[in-house]
Amino acid sequence: MSQVAAESTAGLDQQFVGLDLKSSDNQNGGGNTESKGRYIPPHLRNRETSKGVCDKDSSGWSCSKDKDAYSSFGSRDSRGKPNYFSDRGSGSRGRFDDHGRNDYDGIGGRDRTGFGKFERSGHSRWSDRSDEDDWSKPLPPSERLEQELFSGGNTGINFEKYDDIPVEATGNNCPPHIENFSDIEMGEIIMGNIELTRYTRPTPVQKHAIPIIKEKRDLMACAQTGSGKTAAFLLPILSQIYTDGPGEALKAMKENGRYGRRKQYPISLVLAPTRELAVQIYEEARKFSYRSRVRPCVVYGGADTVQQIRDLERGCHLLVATPGRLVDMMERGKIGLDFCKYLVLDEADRMLDMGFEPQIRRIVEQDTMPPKGVRHTMMFSATFPKEIQMLARDFLDEYIFLAVGRVGSTSENITQKVVWVEELDKRSFLLDLLNATGKDSLTLVFVETKKGADSLENFLFQERYACTSIHGDRSQKDREEALHQFRSGRKPILVATAVAARGLDISNVKHVINFDLPSDIEEYVHRIGRTGRVGNLGLATSFFNERNLNITKDLLDLLVEAKQEVPSWLESMAYEHHYKGSSRGRSKSRFSGGFGARDYRQSSGSANAGFNSNRANSSRSSGSSHNRGFGGGGYGGFYNNDGYGGNYNSQAVDWWGN
C-alpha cells in the first residue's frame, strides 16, 4: 500500500511540474519547444506567436500597444494612445484607475464609441473617453436616428406676417437682433440640425433671444404662444456647450464615481410646469443635440423613478425637469447642480400658478447651484404678471426684458369667434362644429373639469366620433398614449382640461373649441394658443353664456387687440360690466395696467432698488408703441361689423373664412 501511495504522489508531483509554465519555460531556455506530455490550457495555446493581435482573455480585450490610436469602433483615447483594457494582473476591474490615466478602467465600464453610444460590460461604471476631444466637431451621422428625430417636422405657412410684429428690448447694451440663423456663429452641429429641422427663418423671439443668450446676458422674454420659444433658448445654449465643452462637470462626475456613486452634474437645467411640456422640450433638445456629445435627459412626476435614474446614470449634460421630481432626485443624491451654467424657467407663470415657487426657490437659492451673475438665467413665458417679474428680480442679474408681439395678447394667425350658447345647447352646437370640420383636421376641445372631460368623451364616442381625452387623473402612460393618438390623427378630437393647455406643441391643430370658458383670461390666451402655432393659421371658437360674465371685459380687450370681429352683444355686456364694476375700484386685470405687460423696471421708477430704470437703452423694431399695456389703441375702428351677432347657423357664413 505504501509503495502504491508513493508512486501516486510522485505521479501527481510530476503533473504539477508539467503545469508550471515558468519552470517549463526555464527548462527549455525560454523557447517555444514544449515538453512531451505538457498540458497547456486552451486560452494560453499559441500565446507567444500571437503578439500584436487582440486576444480575449479572462479579463477582457487585451490589444497590443502598437495598434493605431483609433479602435475598430471609432473611439479614441484622449491622448492618442490605443483604447485597450489592462490584464487581470494590473487592471482595477472597474474601479477608478489613477495610474497614468484620468479615466475609468475599461473592464466593466461603458465605453463611449465615436457616435456616443455605450457598451455595457460586467459593472456599470461610465467611461467617457472623449472627454478631451473637441465637442464642437460633429459625430458620424445615423440614418435611423435622423429619420426618428426629423421625419415629423413641418414649417408654418404665414411667416411673412412675422415681419410686422413689434418687438421691444429693454436693458443696458442690448445686442443687435439677427435676420437669419447664419448671421450669428452657432457652430457646425447646430447649423446642420437647423437644416434637418427645416427651419428657414428665425421667428421674432428667436431673432432677438439668440444673440442675447449668445452674449451670456440674462433674459426675461415674453412672447406669443407658439412663437418658437423652445428653440430660442435651446439653440444658443447647446451652441455654447459645444464650444466650451463639459468643463468641470465631467471631472466632478468622475471624482464622484470613484466612491461608487453615480451622481450627475448637468451643465444646463430647464424647468417646466407639466410632464407633457417637459417631454416636448426634451424631444426638441434631442433634435438639436444630434451628432453631438451632449446627452439630454428628462425627469418628471408620474413616471417610473427607477427607470429615470437608470437613464440619468448613462450621463446627463442637459436636464429637463418638473420642479417636484427634480427636488426628489436631488435629495436622492442623483443630481448635483454645482456646475450648472444655464438655467431656464419655461412657462414660469404657470409654475407659480401650480404652487411650485417653494420648489423653485429650493432648487435655485437653497442648494449648490451657482449664484446669479455666475450662472446664466433665462425666463420664458407667454405672460408675465407682477409675481413673475418679482421672481426675476431675485433670479436674474442685469437682465434684458424682451417683449415680442403684444405681451399677453393672442396671435393674429388665430381667428377667434365667440358665440352665445346656453349650457344645455353646448353638445348639439359642438356636433355642428365637428361636422363642419374636415376629417383630417385636428380639433382640441377644452372643458373645465375632469368629470366633464370623461362625460364629453363618452358622448362623442356614442355619436361615433374618433376621440380621446386627457386630464390630471389619467396615468402618465394613458396621457402619452392619448397625445400620440391625437398627433398621429388616429383620433383627431382631443377633449382636455387645463393640463394640456400650456406649452404643448401640436403643430397642426386646426380648431380649438372652448366648450367651457376658463375663469381667467390668461388661461384663455394659452388655450387658444394651441392653434395657429409657428406661422400656421388656426381657428378658436368659444361658447359664452351667463356663467362667463367675469371675463367679459378682458375678452373684449383681447378681441380688439387681435383685430377680431366682436359680437355686438359682447360689446354691450362689457360696457354694462365695466360700469357696474367701476364703483368697486379699478379693475385688477393684468390687461388693465402696464405692470405685467412691460418691463417692471420702467414702470416702477426708482422706488425698486436693484432694477435698472434706464429707458434710453430700450430698443424697438417692427412696430408701434404700446400705449394700452399690451399694445393697440382705442376701440375706434375695430367695430365696423356690428351685424356679427353670433348667428353661425346661417348658410351665408363660411365658418372657415373661405
Curated annotation (Swiss-Prot):
Per the record, residues carrying N6-acetyllysine are K56, K117
- Gene Ontology annotations for the cellular component aspect, listed alphabetically: cytosol; nucleus
Q: Where is this motif: Q motif?
A: 179-207
Location of cross-link Glycyl lysine isopeptide (Lys-Gly) (interchain with G-Cter in SUMO2): K214
* Motif DEAD box in this chain: 346-349
Residue spans of biased composition, Basic and acidic residues class: 45-69, 94-129
In residue numbers, the region (Disordered) covers 1-143, 597-627
Instruction: Give UniProt keywords alphabetically.
Output: Acetylation, ATP-binding, Cytoplasm, Helicase, Hydrolase, Isopeptide bond, Methylation, Nucleotide-binding, Nucleus, Phosphoprotein, RNA-binding, Ubl conjugation
**Tissue specificity remark:** Found in heart, brain, liver, skeletal muscle, kidney and testis. Low expression detected in lung. In testis, expressed in all types of spermatogenic cells including spermatogonia, spermatocytes, spermatids and somatic Sertoli cells within the seminiferous tubules. Also expressed in Leydig cells and other interstitial cells.
The record's listing under SUPFAM superfamilies reads: P-loop containing nucleoside triphosphate hydrolases
Modified sites of kind Phosphoserine: S86, S90, S130, S182, S455, S592, S603
Q: Which reaction does it catalyse?
A: ATP + H2O = ADP + phosphate + H(+)
**What task does this protein carry out?**
Probable ATP-dependent RNA helicase. During immune response, may enhance IFNB1 expression via IRF3/IRF7 pathway.
PANTHER family hit by this protein: ATP-DEPENDENT RNA HELICASE DBP3
Please report the name of this protein according to its UniProt entry.
ATP-dependent RNA helicase DDX3Y
Instruction: Name its species.
Output: Mus musculus (Mouse)
Gene name, Swiss-Prot/TrEMBL: Ddx3y
